[in-house]
Swiss-Prot record:
Region described as G5: 259-261
Sorted UniProt keywords: GTP-binding, Membrane, Mitochondrion, Mitochondrion inner membrane, Nucleotide-binding
Span of domain Era-type G: 32-280
Organism: Caenorhabditis elegans
Name the record gives this protein: GTPase Era, mitochondrial
Keyword Iron: no
Binding-site list for GTP: 40-47, 87-91, 160-163
Primary gene name: eral-1
BP terms from Gene Ontology: positive regulation of egg-laying behavior; regulation of aerobic respiration; ribosomal small subunit assembly
Coiled coil: none
Amino acid sequence: MIIKRLNFSCRLFSTASTSTSYEKTPIQPATKCLQLAVIGAPNVGKSLLTNSLIRCPLSAVSSKMDTTTRNISASICSDSTQLVFVDSPGAVSTSHVRQTMKKTSATSGDRVLQDPERALQRAQHVLVVQDSTAPGAYIHHRVLHMLHRYSHVPSILVMNKIDLVMRRSDLLPLVEILTNGQLSDNQQISTKPAQIGRLGKSLSTNIQSSSSFKPSDEKWQSQFRELIQKPTWKCSYSETRSLFRTICGWSGFERVFFVSSLNGEGIDELRDHLMSISPQGEWKMQDGMPTGESAQQLCIDSIRAAVLDTTPSDVAYTVQIRISEWEEQGEVLQIVGEIRCQKPRDGSLIIGKGGKRISEIGRRVNEHLHSLFQRQLYARLIVTHNGKLITQSK
């Protein structure tokens, strides 16, 4: 195994207006910084949204749930202002972590469960990401629980994936439900009758929002007081689902933004707004380096995302990935990534007939890393079981 600790600086995005090194430039009183938590249900596009906001493909993304398994900090600087985003895992249950993600040990699953709330603990603002095409008009009950626990932190509702919505007018009545018909400044949201739901599919309107739901039942009030004192990850999935089963929205949103993280629609407006509300403060991250993550960890994330996108879930979630070689050869960074499988047949499945699947995984990884690091590199992937190399599909 060869891993050299190189002075490897990923040439990631940096705005042109900040031309000098952050380390060489003392913090000025006029600098501004806003720390944001990006939270939401699984697979709503939190990572792609973060990438779009920082103009860098930092977080690995895939079409599968649970691509992000820990908090990832990312930043962007413009003039004297820095935005620091914490992209968090989707809010899931303990059983999901064990059964779907195949994380059976307490330590391996802890970050998936706890990191969404950890992202909120130091946040000055919250971005709640909602899939505009998702069936059902409600904010996920785990997200609602966190919003109630951190109600003192200002929040923004981000309606993502609007490029997939056939009729944009459908979004207004949906947002009315998700915001309880108003924003935190008591501004009313006016709408007209329209169908809502996945791509225009009509949805039953016998829904009760939390603004009209005023529980008088002492049992409910007692349950609320008890659960709101506990971190979300310490509440069972059934507890939060039962608590918020008739509550669909959150009245505390300051603003609502409609965006497409895929094609960039609405992203500039959201970023500009966040820049405009940033308070004075010292920058938290180095200018020109939008993350504190190591290059090796970003490579592992990229390989995992490519495996998730190309391999059946029952195999993809069980593999372990490590970097076995990371070495400069001239101007080219040579990387060897090892995909460790639980069973030999899993390795054969990942390699695919004639090596087609592993070739596709490698193509995706190299394409992403080249875009991320902006330098010459080559990532070679090997598949192993119990330390033995699997060379072909059987």
